[in-house]
Amino acid sequence: MKLSKKSLITFLLAFYSFIGYAQVIDHWETVIYNTDQWSYFVGNSEPNANWANTSFNTSSWSKGSGGIGYEDEDDNTIIPQTRSLYIRTNFTLVDASVIKYIVLNADYDDAFVAYLNGTEIARSNIGTVGVRPSYNTYADTYHEANLYQGGLPEDYIFNEAEFKSLISSGTNTLAIQIHNNSPSSSDLSSNFFLSLGISDQSKNYRENPSWFQAPTGPQVSLLDVKLPIVVITTENNIEIQNEPKVTAQMGI
């Protein structure tokens, strides 16, 4: 079987994407756990318009350990039955410049929208991107949480180009609104984690959850790989095949 020029290029891109990722990320740490202390607002009315911003004063909000919700036995803070819930927590970044990837792990019932320092970064199962759902908006469909059943949370992966303008060294805020899918819904879950891909050997945060899986492969943007292009020129322009040896020169 012959290896076409297109296949060779695809192989090289995949290979150098992996190598570049390995060089960019030294290790992963987790800066937010689901069980951290969160400020929360039960959605019986609309929250303050600035509720997701770092500058918002949460003194009038309740406080509790996440997850926050009811039923399913995956909640550390129990709340009354509700159509929506708003939660937020601050976290401190020692040096934002060494953070190259961020992973938001989300385990929820039934829908959510997440904001980083007031800017939407992820949503699932509700509404239109960029439009904040009102407190009385229901999820598009039913969605069950996974962790309490032995499953894994969903992951939302962001490279540096996507979050660089959103974070800074010092205090930052992760804010999330969670919505049920019907007035009679029997449960609500809100378990969220935030993990960081760090480019140096500094250790300023916490170990990753045991189930955490660092992103690899196509989830890593080739735009982040600052490596030279490898050019292979075969002798007499012979097409590369799988088995026969081919005399070639590799150059940059």
What is the meaning of each model-derived region?
Residues 54-90:
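Surface-exposed, low-complexity/disordered Ser/Thr/Gly/Pro/Asn-rich loops and linkers
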Residues 176-185:
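Short beta-strand-plus-loop segments that form exposed binding edges in beta-rich domains
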Residues 119-160:
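Exoplasmic/lumenal beta-rich domain surfaces
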Residues 1-11:
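Bacterial N-terminal signal peptides that target proteins for export
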Residues 24-54, 221-225:
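GGW-centered surface loops in extracellular recognition modules
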Residues 17-19:
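N-terminal signal peptide c-region/cleavage motif recognized by signal peptidases
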Residues 188-252:
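Phosphate-handling architecture centered on phosphoinositide signaling
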Residues 38, 61, 83, 91, ...:
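Aromatic-lined ligand-binding clefts that engage carbohydrates, nucleic acids, or primary amines
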